[in-house]
Amino acid sequence: MIGSFLLLGALFIPIGVVLKGQSDGVVEYSQQYDGAGSIHTECGITEANTNQECTIDFTANQKMEEPVYVYYELSNFYQNHRRYVKSISYKQLQGKTDSADVSFTDDCQPLQYITKPDTTNPDTSKQILLSPCGLIANSLFNDVISTTTESIAAGFGMKEEGIAWESDVEEKYLQPDGFKYEECFDTVGDSNCSTLCNQEGWCGTAKEPYVDADSKKYAFFYPDDINIQYLYESYPEVVSPIEGVKNEHFIVWMRTAGLPKFRKLYGIIEKDIEKGETGEWCEYLWNGLFATFN
């Protein structure tokens, strides 16, 4: 019996040595940019619905080999609360959309609807179904973190794809049934985008084509958008209408944390950061702590 334990111990020693070496090789830098204790007073938010932008500098005291992972950290946020965890409609996240029969969203209580002015009668209001509904989806971390133009020019651009589980992206989160989009073009004397958007079944009610970061234009359609508010409408600074629930920041957020203090992956830098190099980050803020690892 003792011999068996000694043998097992001997087998685990090299594994422990390897894991310890990898752990010691991790380089971490973090800065709190909002809340009590933050030195970045320019980043603080004191009112709701405030767009606040600030820049944070990181100087590497050690070399960070690629890939460098960028995380945000929240504390005192109980994603593991029973009522919070249960407030989700998996059928809706799989594409089911029907504002006339919303029994499939019952699990989203207490957050299935929001009240908005009635577009047909400004003096009244109406309930609009949220898609996706529920507390998890509608408490999305919506700070926008990006490297500055100067950092991007120096090769420190941050990739925001490949941060979520591949199985989640491909199978678990699907755009609403009936959703479609198509790239369109505007030329002198011929507005393909306007033609598409004026056709029934495209671009929705009084919506303009979506223009991405590369200045490409897209006509798009979401079913029953008069009676449903979709994710891109709830978080226009974070989620585009073309990606919707396929947005990887959203998918990462939907994997709830087990503890009230947690980190979630935001992006990846695919370039070594040499000792002494300084990177600048733009923050469009909510509340959190920002960290980098390699």
Feature annotation, model-predicted:
Residues I56-N61, H249-G258, F262-G276:
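Short, surface-exposed tryptophan/glycine-enriched loops
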Residues V70, Y266-N294:
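Extended, hydrophilic extramembrane loops/domains of integral membrane proteins
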Residues W165, W202, W253, W281, ...:
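A residue-identity detector for tryptophan
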